[in-house]
Amino acid sequence: MGPIRNFDIVTSEFIQILHTGHMHWVCVSSIGCTPGIVKLYDSLYHDIIEEEVTEQVKSLMADSYIGLVNVPVQQQLSGSDCGVFAVAFSTSLVYAFHSQDFTFDIPNMRPHLCQCLRMGELTMFPTI
């Protein structure tokens, strides 16, 4: 997506991984939301929703956008796990699990993602 934002407007529920513009990845989703509302799954949340994320979601939804709501989720322990967390949050949404209800097994997240990519299928990430 990024600064060009060359994509189709979404008209149904969606899950999207977005780059914040500051070396960070997050997951957003409208699954189970009131129309126009989008949930933000951010493993490095600091009480501020990045303007770039808001602008990308507005571009995705056009006139139907109302607002973003932060979902309290597990926070990453290092400065380099945001991408794997964004994929894990997305995967849990696909499988209809709520990321705030469990704790991912961080040391096993990257090996799991590598295995999923080799197999060509995303499965639930390991939890503790």
Model-derived features with residue positions:
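Cysteine protease-like catalytic core of ubiquitin/ubiquitin-like
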Residues: 1-122
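Intrinsically disordered, low-complexity regulatory segments enriched in Ser/Pro/Gln/Gly
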Residues: 122-128
